[in-house]
A protein has these predicted regions:
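Active-site beta-loop-alpha junctions enriched in small/polar residues
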Residues: 3-7, 72-76, 139-143
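Aromatic- and acidic-residue-enriched carbohydrate-binding clefts of CAZyme catalytic domains
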Residues: 8-62, 77-116, 145-166
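A short, terminal or domain-edge coil/loop segment
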Residues: 7, 20, 63-65, 122-133
Length: 175
């Protein structure tokens, strides 16, 4: 699979959300994403345009290779949340940390704006790639990432969901 997003960057052009790449694919001093892992203070990074992806898919097809895109969700979304903080509930007072030491890197799939965003992004990606599946990660979500979320607590009560794991399963089955 082709890992196109993670905590560190957003590497695929989504036409409906251009800030994902203009702000989320570069890091450096005075950038939305600060320098990581020795990348230095100069602006560094980049992304794949949809035309470049189509070209790569076409080339891979000639070699009998299929490409499965991966958009890492609901965790591993630190960069996404720097660009679109509204995808995480502001009233949540929990500070969660993942295995890579990124704090608060999990989107809130119970929010309508998050559902709309996911629908838009996954539709653009499914129109772009010929592979029948999109890998959405679902790994390494910090255990307490949704504990303080009033909207998730409310959603879980309304839908008789008893744990964050069950909520994640529900989310996965409905995106």
């Amino acid at each position: 699979h082709w890992h196109l997003t993670d905590n560190e960057a957003w590497r695929i052009e989504i036409k409906k959300y251009p800030n994902l790449t203009t702000q989320g694919s570069y890091r450096g001093y005075n950038q939305k994403i600060p320098p990581f892992y020795g990348s230095g203070y100069n602006k560094y990074g980049g992304y794949y345009s949809q035309d470049e992806i189509r070209e790569l898919i076409s080339y891979a097809k000639k070699l009998n290779i299929e490409i499965m895109p991966e958009i890492d969700l609901p965790a591993h979304s630190w960069t996404l949340l720097q660009v679109m903080p509204e995808l995480r509930e502001e009233t949540s007072n929990i500070i969660s940390e993942d295995v890579g030491s990124y704090k608060n890197n999990t989107i809130n799939p119970s929010l309508e704006k998050t559902k709309s965003f996911l629908n838009d992004v996954l539709l653009e990606i499914s129109d772009l790639f010929t592979f029948p599946y999109i890998h959405v990660g679902l790994d390494e979500r910090p255990n307490n990432s949704w504990e303080g979320s009033p909207s998730i607590i409310h959603f879980m009560k309304q839908n008789n969901i008893n744990s964050q794991e069950e909520f994640q399963d529900y989310y996965m089955n409905n995106i």
